[in-house]
A protein has these predicted regions:
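Surface-exposed patches in mature extracellular/periplasmic domains of secreted proteins
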Residues: 104-111, 132-135
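Beta-loop motif signature
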Residues: 15, 21-52, 104
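Boundary regions of SH3-family modules and the immediately adjacent low-complexity/disordered segments
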Residues: 1-23, 53-54, 58-95, 102
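Short, basic/aromatic beta-hairpin or loop at an interaction surface
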Residues: 15-29, 125-140
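Aromatic- and glycine-rich peptidoglycan recognition patches
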Residues: 3-7, 12, 17-20, 76-82, ...
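...with weaker cross-activation on analogous glycine-rich loops/strands in unrelated enzymes
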Residues: 131-190
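Sec/Tat-exported extracytoplasmic proteins
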Residues: 100-104, 123, 127-131, 164
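Active-site nucleophilic cysteine motif
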Residues: 96, 108-127
Length: 190
């Protein structure tokens, strides 16, 4: 809805307050609970402050201070995302497939346009994990899995990285990331 700066402490406080995460690909914040005038649009993973409830709507405050109403079914509490006990790979695969057909945009990280690392970071965000922004950063976390010709070592939800191996004259260069979804198939944004 709007760009705003947050300190580390403010980000930690998100789970202590009534903040919600938008869980649909697209949506709207309405000026009133009658859904007659649009304040702004929403995309998957937008974080908004919940200030009240009216029937089937949440009253919300946007980062820039504007207020409005959002349908309750489109919002989950931040705590429900970040207090998960395990990674649900079935949910990762299901959500990954909802991005089929979304336009590629270098640096994109929304359901309107997305790049490879924006794609993987959104999928893992909904599992309560915050990945670094770029593929070259994401590869530094997790556990290395040996590759073979038929992908039998991979599990659904594994991140697959692409690039150039290190040589004597140049370092390794990671330039792309995707997610393994099973049966020898991976999904990515390109």
């Amino acid at each position: 809805p709007a760009v705003s700066l947050r300190t580390q402490k403010q980000m930690e406080n998100l789970t202590d307050q009534a903040f919600g995460i938008f869980i649909r690909q697209f949506g709207q914040v309405f000026k009133n609970d009658g859904k007659t005038e649009v304040v702004t649009d929403l995309v998957l993973a937008d974080i908004i402050r919940i200030t009240g409830k009216i029937n089937t709507m949440y009253k919300v405050e946007l980062p820039d201070g504007r207020e409005g109403y959002v349908e309750k079914e489109g919002i989950v509490n931040v705590k429900s995302i970040f207090n998960q006990k395990f990674v649900d790979t079935v949910q990762i695969v299901r959500m990954a497939k909802t991005f089929m057909g979304v336009s590629y945009l270098w640096g994109g990280k929304s359901s309107k346009a997305i790049d490879c690392s924006g794609f993987t970071s959104i999928l893992y965000f909904f599992q309560g994990l915050i990945l670094q922004r770029d593929a070259s950063q994401q590869i530094k976390y997790g556990e290395l899995v040996k590759t073979n010709s038929n992908f039998t070592n991979f599990k659904a939800g594994d991140l697959l990285f692409f690039g150039k191996k290190a040589t004597q004259s140049s370092p390794e260069k990671v330039s792309h990331v995707g997610i393994y979804i099973g049966d020898g198939i991976f999904i990515h944004s390109s």
